[in-house]
């Protein structure tokens, strides 16, 4: 596997712009682009195979707010596109698939309304990624604002035998922080599941990516690319 397949660049959307939050805090926002679809085109031209898109306002408010921009991103990226944030119903998931999105990333709905979540899995098998967002060792939902008593391992195992594609596992305390990756949570969850796991949160350097390589099947990288911590030269020389 080459790094362009392992790394999944992230575009987080707010008010139609590409932004990054610091540790999931909606008050700590940095804008990186007013035209996110141009970022998507750049990532496509560079040969990345998958793009991770998050509708932050959707995650916070419960339904996607940046559909027009997501549509443009889809048009400008040749590989696979996965979208998360505010997918709390079958209708919203279907609307995204109808736009040509390859995978949807869902966490809150899987926790709060299993019946509705299973309806999506039934109609779109192997196209749903279960979002496991971990805060101090417990799953957080609702745009990371609501904490549960469930461990990431318990949440993952609940759906391991259903037709999900795999898992997106985010360590919230590190997300957008450039503090580096803790590989232990990923090693732990891999003991419990066989489906692919994508890591997310805290990647700050090529070293972090090397640490994760061989443990998980992919890694979402956002801020480290936008802040120049990981350069294209790094990727080509890996």
Swiss-Prot record:
Task: Please give the pathway this protein is involved in.
Answer: Amino-acid biosynthesis; L-histidine biosynthesis; L-histidine from 5-phospho-alpha-D-ribose 1-diphosphate: step 4/9
Name the catalysed reactions: 1-(5-phospho-beta-D-ribosyl)-5-[(5-phospho-beta-D-ribosylamino)methylideneamino]imidazole-4-carboxamide = 5-[(5-phospho-1-deoxy-D-ribulos-1-ylimino)methylamino]-1-(5-phospho-beta-D-ribosyl)imidazole-4-carboxamide
Q: Which CDD domains match?
A: HisA
Which top EC class applies here? isomerase
Which Enzyme Commission number(s) are listed? 5.3.1.16
Q: Where is the active site?
A: 12 (proton acceptor), 133 (proton donor)
Family membership: Belongs to the HisA/HisF family.
Q: Name one GO molecular function term.
A: 1-(5-phosphoribosyl)-5-[(5-phosphoribosylamino)methylideneamino]imidazole-4-carboxamide isomerase activity
The record's Gene Ontology cellular component field reads: cytoplasm
This protein's name: 1-(5-phosphoribosyl)-5-[(5-phosphoribosylamino)methylideneamino] imidazole-4-carboxamide isomerase
Organism of derivation:
Aquifex aeolicus (strain VF5)
* Gene Ontology biological process terms in this record: L-histidine biosynthetic process
Keywords of the record: Amino-acid biosynthesis, Cytoplasm, Histidine biosynthesis, Isomerase
What the entry lists under NCBIfam families is as follows:
1-(5-phosphoribosyl)-5-[(5-phosphoribosylamino)methylideneamino]imidazole-4-carboxamide isomerase
Source gene?
Answer: hisA
Subcellular location per the Swiss-Prot or TrEMBL entry:
Cytoplasm
